[in-house]
Amino acid sequence: MSGVLPHQRPTAPNTIEDERVGTITRRTVLTGAAVTAAVTVAAIDIPAHAHSVDVNSPEHMVLFVLLSSALTGIAPKKLAPGFKLQSSNPPTVPPPPIDLSKSIPGSDPVDVKREYVTWANEKYPSGLEYLLGLVRKNLNASKRDEAIIAALQFDDDDKTKTSSDVDAKYLARSIVLMWYLSAWYEPTELKALRKELPQDPTRTPKFQIISPKAYTQAWALRVAQAHPMGFSEMQFGYWTRPPNDIHDFIGG
């Protein structure tokens, strides 16, 4: 039910793929759609320290799942089954503050979210810390996802923003594409694409397949209620029945 584009054969981990077959492929179309959908991101004043994100920390994983949910529009419990936010006090009105130390980051059969957070942390540690800090800042906001997105929208030429702000903005886009396509698009590549695409409509971004495990977990085909070639979690004969509602796939 999940995975990469159906025409694509499994690709060796960490290989660069930039090959075109003809002028338009399904990957080109879906990648373009995902790049367009990837959010634009802005800033908060958080100091950056390399590798200060601990990928083995349950608290940091909770923040990463919340960040990913806000950016992709996919419910946290779909990204990480069993995910649950906990409060330090009994339920009240308004709700008590969230206690990250008691919250549950959830799991999935292949734990692909750990691959994604590890990849982002190794590539852009300060940017990932920046984004998780933004989630922490808005953790108890009544409309947390909207607050995160609103804080992450600005033009590249905004003079009030720093280079760190811009870097975090494009890292957020890379995280969106990781979840939807199970591939890594360098933030610098996405930034260059934004500038060059109007002049060169044939320009396509280079990317890396993250892992064979990730091949089966891309959300692009889940949203399309489909599955990648050679892998399916759906029961044989599912095509003879009407598809489930989209919310059964992505939550919400």
Segments (PLM) and residue ranges:
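N-terminal secretory signal peptides
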Residues: 1-24
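N-terminal twin-arginine translocation
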Residues: 22-28, 38-56
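Sec-dependent signal peptide hydrophobic core
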Residues: 33-37
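Solvent-exposed, polar/charged alpha-helical surfaces in well-ordered, non-transmembrane soluble domains
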Residues: 62-65, 69, 114, 173, ...
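Structured domain cores in non-transmembrane regions
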Residues: 75-169
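Mature-region segments of soluble proteins
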Residues: 130-252
